């Protein structure tokens, strides 16, 4: 189904045949406005597809099925939502002039149902989610202490002046030449570790041995390069203090899960002797019990099993069928039983489900007539009484068994109770014979 992409709307004329009624539809398809990026909005009719069109037609048929009387269709004025489509249905007195070409020369009558349908697709605007790129976090500054301004970590590291550059070696004073040569090679070979540069003074460590005790000597040592010990030269820390020894990853405290266990000690010696071999008792062959030797419990169980297997044989009856009646002969009897059909239909019209008629369901009478005659009988009943969807069980399990019971009564000259009892007995006896002869369940007319 193709539509042009221009115009304010698209008009479609359609002619349907619903049962015995002719339905003339004039469909108005509204476009969907589509707006592209930095462009003007345009009308789009491509949302209507063949699949959606078939769903709209199915929704129209369901609307007709839910009508109790066909006369209510001439007063339709409703709105449906089918597959994200708003369907406006309104009955009119006159059809659209464009539908005259669909009538093939015939004129529309007053019995024709004229409908105006308006289709509008429910659109939903897209929402664009823009991710916000967070800015880089600045280094946290230290809190002001004693009225001084907070200084960043970078400034403090720069002022310390004790951080050696990577790949270079410092020249400490008062160090032997041998130790200097050994440490210079190890310092150049070690890579730079950023983690050690951020180690704070609060971690502890020994004080620098090169610092003097007097204030004057400490001021002089600040002007010149400080001497580093071999342990300080190996350290990459930005602090003037020595790097403490790395603590082992294993805690010296024993975990609580080993509280009830003895770790590292030998178990109390218990002599484990060989396990005694268990002698297996060989099964004793079962003895043949006689009825006289059985106790009360076994005898009662045997009696219950025997009663379960003892199925009573149904009453033997002659199986009566209606195989001599033809299709036209059966359908012509519809008007004879019309009053009985109307009475049962009024009683069960608003019931949610019908399971049987006088304890006779559809499966009990399915073998009395052929399959083709069954289908024609259901079709005839559906044309007259099937105005609502919940009447299916009433037709199959109510009206159809009633019709066959009436045929049984007239053919074999039986009363209603005799005909019902005959159908029940012959169904039970036929099932018993097929089970006795190991034959599959099938119709006697096949």
UniProtKB/Swiss-Prot annotation:
Name assigned to this protein: Uncharacterized protein CG4951
Polar residues: bias regions: 159-170
UniProt KW keywords: Phosphoprotein
Species whose genome carries this gene: Drosophila melanogaster (Fruit fly)
Domain of life: Eukaryota
Keyword Phosphoprotein among UniProt keywords: yes
Lineage: Eukaryota, Metazoa, Ecdysozoa, Arthropoda, Hexapoda
Coiled-coil residue windows: none
Biased composition (Basic residues): 269-280
Keyword Cell membrane in record: no
Compositional bias ranges of the Basic and acidic residues kind: 194-210
């Amino acid at each position: 189904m193709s539509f042009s992409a221009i115009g304010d709307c698209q008009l479609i004329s359609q002619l349907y045949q619903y049962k015995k009624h002719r339905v003339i539809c004039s469909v108005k398809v509204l476009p969907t406005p589509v707006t592209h990026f930095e462009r003007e909005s345009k009308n789009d009719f491509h949302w209507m597809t063949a699949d959606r069109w078939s769903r709209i037609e199915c929704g129209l048929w369901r609307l007709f099925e839910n009508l109790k009387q066909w006369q209510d269709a001439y007063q339709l004025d409703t709105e449906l939502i089918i597959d994200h489509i708003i369907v406006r249905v309104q009955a009119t007195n006159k059809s659209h002039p464009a539908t005259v070409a669909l009538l093939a020369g015939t004129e529309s009558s007053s019995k024709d149902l004229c409908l105006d349908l308006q289709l509008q697709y429910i659109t939903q605007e897209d929402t664009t989610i823009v991710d916000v790129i967070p800015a880089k976090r600045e280094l946290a500054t230290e809190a002001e202490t004693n009225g001084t301004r907070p200084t960043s970590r970078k400034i403090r590291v720069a002022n310390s002046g004790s951080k050696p550059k990577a790949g270079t070696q410092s020249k400490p004073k008062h160090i032997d030449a041998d130790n200097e040569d050994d440490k210079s090679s190890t310092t150049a070979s070690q890579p730079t570790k950023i983690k050690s540069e951020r180690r704070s003074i609060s971690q502890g460590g020994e004080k620098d041995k090169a610092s003097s005790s007097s204030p004057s000597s400490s001021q002089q040592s600040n002007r010149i390069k400080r001497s580093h010990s071999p342990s300080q030269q190996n350290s990459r820390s930005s602090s003037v203090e020595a790097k403490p020894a790395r603590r082992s990853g294993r805690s010296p405290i024993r975990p609580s899960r080993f509280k009830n266990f003895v770790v590292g000690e030998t178990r109390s010696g218990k002599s484990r002797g060989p396990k005694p071999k268990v002698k297996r008792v060989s099964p004793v062959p079962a003895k043949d019990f006689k009825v006289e030797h059985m106790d009360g419990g076994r005898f009662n169980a045997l009696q219950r099993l025997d009663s379960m297997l003892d199925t009573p044989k149904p009453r033997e009856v002659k199986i009566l069928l209606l195989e001599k009646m033809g299709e036209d002969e059966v359908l012509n009897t519809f008007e004879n039983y019309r009053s009985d059909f109307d009475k049962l239909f009024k009683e069960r019209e608003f019931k949610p489900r019908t399971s049987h008629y006088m304890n006779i369901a559809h499966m009990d009478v399915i073998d009395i007539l052929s399959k083709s005659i069954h289908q024609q009988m259901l079709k005839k009943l559906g044309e007259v009484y099937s105005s609502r969807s919940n009447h299916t069980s009433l037709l199959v399990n109510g009206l159809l068994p009633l019709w066959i019971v009436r045929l049984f009564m007239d053919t074999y000259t039986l009363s209603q109770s005799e005909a019902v009892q005959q159908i029940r007995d012959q169904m039970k006896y036929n099932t018993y014979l097929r089970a006795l002869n190991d034959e599959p369940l099938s119709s006697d007319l096949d």
